[in-house]
A protein has these predicted regions:
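Short, flexible, basic/aromatic active-site loop/helix in glycosyltransferases
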Residues: 125-126, 140-157
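Acidic donor-binding loop at a coil-to-helix junction in glycosyltransferase catalytic cores
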Residues: 183-194
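Conserved donor NDP-sugar-binding/catalytic core segment of glycosyltransferases
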Residues: 106-137
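Glycine-rich, basic loop-to-helix element that forms the pyrophosphate-binding segment
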Residues: 72-89
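Short aromatic/hydrophobic "clamp" motif used to bind/position activated sugar donors
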Residues: 93-94
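Non-catalytic, C-terminal membrane-associated alpha-helical segments of glycosyltransferases
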Residues: 227-231, 246-314
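A conserved acidic beta->alpha catalytic loop
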Residues: 45-58, 101
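Short, well-formed alpha-helical segments that are part of the catalytic scaffolds
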Residues: 15-34
Length: 314
């Protein structure tokens, strides 16, 4: 049987303990995949985006030849993801997973099986956010950490890169990389996946591939989730703006997301007001979430970007 080569790409930034724990789980799944007769030879790549290379010792402590370490000092998620694309240039497939995620059993084989069925350009799996048990109920009922699901094989128009398998031959043929303009703001995966589809690629959903993300307490707050809602709206509009190929298309994009933003602000504010009136946390929280996304879209339509992952120079 011909052998396909697969690289599991783990991007990391100053999470050595989580990285070490996650790698042990990933390596167990790599062992299963390599031995199960699918004809796939898998290995692991860790891309360390810390300028001082803080993950090097964590990788070295594993003493496992299946794990390669790459230091990418240029700040930003886009730089890290593009480094993974470059380091995996001799592979057929690249599976992205983040350093704060833990894959469930079958995560990797499910991605591969879904890809083998129709050979799409990309396969997106689920990321399940485990919110702390003592989190503000308002945050939970607001659905800030809920994500849509689809039947396996469903084609989708946009994908996140937290659990994403790429057919590298197709990605290279389409000439798509992660845009550095969104490296510190987030949303680089939105633009990347939309560009894949625009150039003729296909992205399909895999519901059986699941990675868990344990949400830190500092992120399960009203302030953080509302800021993230704004950022999601902002990056969605910016991605559309960056996809525009000329002045006319940029004008259309700005108008489109100005109108969408205003509609969300109006609808979200109304739902929030109803929630306050009837004492419904669900309507109040979801209304504010919608309104904040709309505000982010308005800013994105103007070209304003918020670098959520900006780093201190100190």
């Amino acid at each position: 049987m011909p052998v396909l080569t697969l690289v599991v790409g783990v991007l990391t930034y100053r999470r050595a303990d989580q990285l070490r724990a996650g790698l042990s789980v990933i390596l167990a799944q790599v062992s299963i995949l390599n031995a199960d007769g699918r004809g796939v030879a898998a290995r692991v790549l860790v891309v360390d985006n810390d300028p001082v290379g803080s993950a090097r010792s964590a990788v070295a402590s594993l003493a496992d030849s299946r794990v390669k370490y790459a230091h990418e000092p240029v700040p930003g998620i886009s730089a890290g993801r593009n480094r993974a694309l470059d380091e995996a240039s001799d592979a057929d497939l690249l599976a992205f997973i983040d350093d704060d995620e833990t894959p469930r059993p079958g995560w990797l084989t499910a991605l591969v099986d879904t890809w083998l069925s129709t050979r799409p350009t990309a396969v997106m799996g689920r990321v399940f956010f485990n919110v702390p048990a003592d989190a503000d109920p308002w945050v939970v009922t607001g659905g800030f950490f809920a994500r849509p699901r689809h039947p396996t094989g469903t084609e989708i128009a946009v994908a996140g890169a937290g659990n994403l398998l790429l057919d590298l031959r197709q990605v290279r043929a389409l000439g798509v990389r992660f845009d550095p303009r969104l490296g510190l703001s987030g949303g680089e995966d939105t633009l990347f996946s939309r560009l894949l589809v625009r150039r003729g690629g296909r992205i399909v959903w895999c519901d059986e591939s699941v990675a868990d993300d344990n949400v830190p307490a500092k992120r399960a707050t009203r302030q953080w989730v509302l800021q993230r809602a704004w950022r999601v709206g902002n990056c969605t509009a910016l991605a559309d703006l960056y996809l525009a190929g000329n002045v006319a298309e940029r004008c259309v994009s700005r108008v489109r997301y100005t109108l969408r933003g205003l509609a969300r602000i109006a609808g979200g504010t109304l739902r929030y007001a109803v929630g306050r009136l009837v004492g419904s946390d669900r309507h109040e929280a979801r209304g504010l979430r919608t309104a904040r996304r709309g505000q982010g879209m308005l800013s994105g339509a103007r070209g304003t970007r918020f670098d959520e992952y900006a780093r201190s120079v100190a």
